[in-house]
Regions:
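C-terminal segment of classical bacterial N-terminal signal peptides
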Residues: 1-3
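Sequence signature of WD/YWTD-type beta-propeller architectures
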Residues: 5-284
Length: 284
């Protein structure tokens, strides 16, 4: 059972000065820039939080969905959607080095890009159910655990081998899956049920709360959104933090429709349907 309590100490909530209406796709691990996209995840733009300068990384559809940033903040990995003459959707996985501007095609257009993860030297990719490792730049590729979704089922790839995880059963659909920062736990959302955490082998699955779009704040804390809709429009949403034992704290007020959080140590950033962005500064 969840209970309300203190999870994080909110020191301030600051509105980000955006060049135009946008949604936040990611915050850098160092907290010095945001990646922005549109409300439909089209395009990807870097916004420097210190000076407000922008750098367009992509104008393609889906570029703002499921963006990954390397731990040093230098490499951005994203996918672009395209359509062939039969109107079939394809995904191309790309990376760009923000320092040099060099870009790489990591996976050529495919119908079955299921998941990818980034560490300091490589990108682990699951495509058509098969795992591959792509080095970033000249670094040697490592073997990452990679979470992916295949036909609604939660999969995990460890040491190059992919297996079904789906801890709550095959009859459910899964989304918003991510590894804890220490790589020992899996966070996921079970459609229409709530947010759960389990071990890498799928054991010890436990419900954390009903929040959606969950992300890790640290190894023992998650952040998500509690949104309410009338079947067509979202009319209210707050950002919440929760410990793994289910203690939950609401971080934002009812005056803002706060959605889709992204978190690093000390900062949580969220977007609003009006195209605004805010940063919640927190301590533990």
């Amino acid at each position: 059972m969840s209970a309300m309590g203190q999870v994080l100490n909110v020191t301030s909530i600051n509105k980000v000065n955006l060049p135009e209406k946008a949604a936040v796709a990611a915050i850098s691990p160092q907290g010095d820039y945001l990646l922005l996209t549109s409300s439909t995840n089209q395009g990807l733009t870097k916004l420097d939080l210190a000076n407000g300068q922008t750098q367009v990384l992509s104008t393609a559809p889906s570029a703002g969905h499921n963006v990954k940033i390397s731990p040093d903040g230098q490499t951005v990995v994203y996918h672009e959607s395209s359509f062939n003459d039969k109107h079939l959707r394809f995904s191309t996985l790309k990376s760009v080095n923000l320092g040099t501007g060099d870009s790489q095609v990591l996976v050529k257009p495919t119908r079955n890009l299921q998941g990818y993860a980034v560490d300091a030297t490589s990108v682990g990719v699951v495509n058509k159910g098969k795992f591959s490792n792509k080095a970033i730049g000249t670094a040697k590729a490592q073997k990452l655990p990679v979470l992916s979704i295949n036909k609604g089922q939660l999969m995990i790839t460890v040491n190059g081998k992919t297996k079904k995880l789906s801890p709550n059963g095959d009859q459910f659909s899964y989304m918003w899956a991510s590894l804890s920062p220490d790589g020992t736990k899996v966070l996921y959302y079970q459609a229409a049920h709530g947010t759960y955490v389990c071990n890498l082998d799928g054991s010890n699955a436990r419900k954390v709360g009903k929040m959606r779009a969950p992300v890790w704040y640290d190894d023992n804390t998650i952040v998500g959104m509690m949104d309410m809709d009338d079947g067509e429009f979202i009319y209210a949403s707050t950002i919440v933090a929760a410990t793994l034992d289910g203690t939950t704290q609401t971080l934002t007020g009812d005056d803002t429709i706060a959605m889709y959080p992204h978190a690093i140590s000390g900062k949580i950033v969220f977007s609003t349907p009006a195209g605004e962005a805010y940063i919640i500064n927190v301590t533990k």
